[in-house]
Regions:
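Hydrophobic small-molecule pocket/channel-lining residues, especially in calycin-type beta-barrels
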Residues: 1-170
Length: 170
């Protein structure tokens, strides 16, 4: 399979550190994260590839994110709001996944932050740039307490899933 040609979001994606805004600084600042933690996050993302493996089928959206600072797997039913208890404490995160088809997904989340509550919209969609397929991520965060918003646009290049799994083992 040629991993550079995609018609849907399914498969492995590696953050393109040379296109868009790969840094999460503005997002993290809006969330109220400390400067020290932001610098550590940026260092981690510079040293280790950020990989997303996406699977959309049977009305479900599954994503496995791996990076120096984030290793998680989530699965949601498309069109159904999901509440998740966060530890420690009894705070909740609410997530709603919507999709207009296999080449686009929008994950809307309301979650607690360092200084209150945030609304996040994470839109992933296929785009064609210079005859190459990329996954464009438009990540919008709004801090409900400060009313501050920030939009980050990141691009991912397609990789074979086996490549993504090899990266995790190294």
């Amino acid at each position: 399979m040629n991993s550079n040609v995609r018609e849907n979001l399914n498969g492995g994606w590696k953050l393109d550190k040379n296109r868009g805004e790969p840094s999460m600084r503005g997002y993290l600042e809006t969330m109220g994260v400390s400067e020290l933690a932001i610098v550590a996050h940026e260092k981690g993302e510079a040293e280790v590839d950020t990989i997303n493996v996406i699977q959309m089928r049977d009305g479900k959206y599954k994503i496995k994110k791996t990076s120096r600072v984030n290793n998680m797997e989530e699965e949601f039913e498309i069109g159904k709001e999901t509440k998740t208890k966060l530890t420690p404490g009894d705070k909740e995160k609410m997530t709603l996944v919507q999709s207009e088809g296999p080449a686009q997904v929008c994950v809307k989340t309301i979650m607690p932050t360092m200084n209150g509550l945030a609304e996040v919209s994470d839109i992933k969609e296929l785009v064609n740039i210079d005859n190459s397929t990329f996954m464009k991520q438009s990540l919008t965060i709004t801090n409900k307490d400060t009313n501050r918003s920030y939009v980050t646009e990141r691009f991912y290049i397609p990789i074979d899933v086996i490549d993504a799994e090899d990266k995790e083992d190294s």
